[in-house]
Amino acid sequence: MTMLKDPSKKYRAFPTIDLPDRTWPSKTIDAAPIWCSSDLRDGNQSLIEPMDAAKKLRFWKTLVSVGVKEIEASFPSASQTDFDFVRTLIEDGHIPDDTTIQVLTQAREDLIARTFESLRGAKKAIVHLYNATSPSFRRIVFNQDKAGVKEIAVNAAKLFVKYAAQQPETQWTFEYSPETFSATELEFAKEVCDAVIEVWNPTPENKVILNLPATVEVATPNIYADQIEWFGRNITRRDSVLISLHTHNDRGTGVAATELGLMAGADRVEGCLFGNGERTGNVDLVTVALNLYTQGIDPELDFSDIDGVRKVVEECNQIPVHPRHPYVGDLVHTAFSGSHQDAIRKGFTQQKDGELWEVPYLPIDPADIGRSYEAVIRVNSQSGKGGITYLLEQEYGISLPRRMQIEFSQVVQGETDRLGLEMSAQQIHSLLRREYLQANTPYALISHKLQEENGNSAVDAEVHVDGETQHWRGKGKGALEALVAGLPVAVEIMDYNEHAIGSGTTAKAAAYIELRVNGERAVHGVGIDENITTASFRALFSALNRSLSQTQAKAA
């Protein structure tokens, strides 16, 4: 079977919502929603190998540590394992006073009774009821009409009231999900929710949660936002209701749907860390939270050690986080492209503490989420001078002059092309040493003596040449001019730069020379030494030897 030439024969577009006076497009998100993690329930049930009790507890503690205040821990009536985990959390004191455990149940009395039993002794708890309401589920799965589906919800809601009354020591919050909400007729979804509200009788001080799932993502995010805004306008007793979003990622727009849903008036978000969940996953709470953070809004979740959180999630879920996953992937703060690297390097150079973050290509400062800058710029065959320069500056304190950046980038390019691999900062530094600092043939500087008198300098350089030692002597206005005067070839110095590497007693001097020998093409040399004069002499010999070697190779 192949893709259809006319897919309209098999698929149809989801109908739009008649909401000409919609207001959400002009709204902005200015505060964090209530966050609810479903990692231990929705996420766990989607795993090939569900978590054992130890992994669940480790995950729970991680969620608490980052600041998630509502955590859906399990489906207690589904298995003894899930039931026991809820009991462990309650009996062993793993639920902080500012954190609320949430559990899920279907709309059957035996399951509801078992669910409430699992929560005995909890200080506070959210009990989450659901039943599917969309036409396809009514027709295909349950063979129920609208009245039957509504009756299921209402009867279960009454059972919630009954069993909660038997445990008055717990502060209860009720949650209802018209499962497959986004594929349900809006009027009917409202009708069912209104009926549940009537039973639960919420108040502004004791609200109910109406969770509106995109159980399967079936339309563009703007349609989901229209559904949320319409629902918020029309639901009864809106001041006593928290509207919760629960999006999935079947069309790849779970985050967008959630953000537009918040703009449309929702109060709460359910999802999973890094987007685990059924099929293509639930909405990624981390991405939504850090999207807020990069807009200057406190997400009220702390991902200062995002790699530590990722480690727990990967080990518990046994699913790796994609290297391109927003904010946390191995490569998301990495630039290989030369132009990108150059822009990032310039951005870091100009960025000052306390100022607005404006580094190109980096929407967030990696340091804010515990990332180092080491992986921001990496060098391969696509890289340019900016990335190479940045790595040498950051790792070794070597600041190449601009024209030398261009020359050395060509050396690195040749090496990456030859190897076909990425080069680390250490490999780049080794290449710099081999190409410049170890360029000691045909002339190797052994030592030098410098005398200065009346503004003039005299140099006596001891040089190793073809197995013998020679003394080159010259005079000039400065040390370099004197050395050039004593050379056996004609040298024209085009540019000279120097800077310190490090500070204090361990500081060294780095010197860079651009010169032309016998009128040939200009080349660069590098010298590093504790003494600045020695460093400059070594840089001159580096450039001299490189020029002569290139001329010899060209002649051959």
Curated annotation (Swiss-Prot):
Give the matching Gene3D superfamilies: 3.30.160.270, Aldolase class I
Any Pfam family hit: IPMS_D2
Annotated compartments: Cytoplasm
| Documented EC number(s) | 2.3.3.13
**Could you say which cofactors this protein requires?**
Mg(2+)
What reaction(s) does this enzyme catalyze? 3-methyl-2-oxobutanoate + acetyl-CoA + H2O = (2S)-2-isopropylmalate + CoA + H(+)
This entry carries the following GO cellular component terms, namely: cytoplasm
Question: Record's CDD domains?
Answer: DRE_TIM_LeuA
> Which domain of life does this protein belong to?
Bacteria
Q: Recall the GO molecular function terms of this protein's record.
A: 2-isopropylmalate synthase activity; acetyl-CoA C-acetyltransferase activity; magnesium ion binding
Sorted alphabetically, the keyword list is:
Amino-acid biosynthesis, Branched-chain amino acid biosynthesis, Cytoplasm, Leucine biosynthesis, Magnesium, Metal-binding, Transferase
> What are the binding positions for Mg(2+) in this chain?
42, 246, 248, 282
Task: Extract the ranges annotated as region (Regulatory domain).
Answer: 439-556
Known pathway: Amino-acid biosynthesis; L-leucine biosynthesis; L-leucine from 3-methyl-2-oxobutanoate: step 1/4
Pyruvate carboxyltransferase domain sequence ranges: 33-307
Enumerate the Gene Ontology biological process terms: L-leucine biosynthetic process
Q: How does it assemble?
A: Homodimer.
User: What family is this?
Assistant: Belongs to the alpha-IPM synthase/homocitrate synthase family. LeuA type 2 subfamily.
| Alphabetical list of HAMAP family matching this protein | LeuA_type2
Its biological purpose is as follows: Catalyzes the condensation of the acetyl group of acetyl-CoA with 3-methyl-2-oxobutanoate (2-ketoisovalerate) to form 3-carboxy-3-hydroxy-4-methylpentanoate (2-isopropylmalate).
Name-wise, this protein is 2-isopropylmalate synthase
The record lists the organism as Pseudomonas savastanoi pv. phaseolicola (strain 1448A / Race 6) (Pseudomonas syringae pv. phaseolicola (strain 1448A / Race 6))
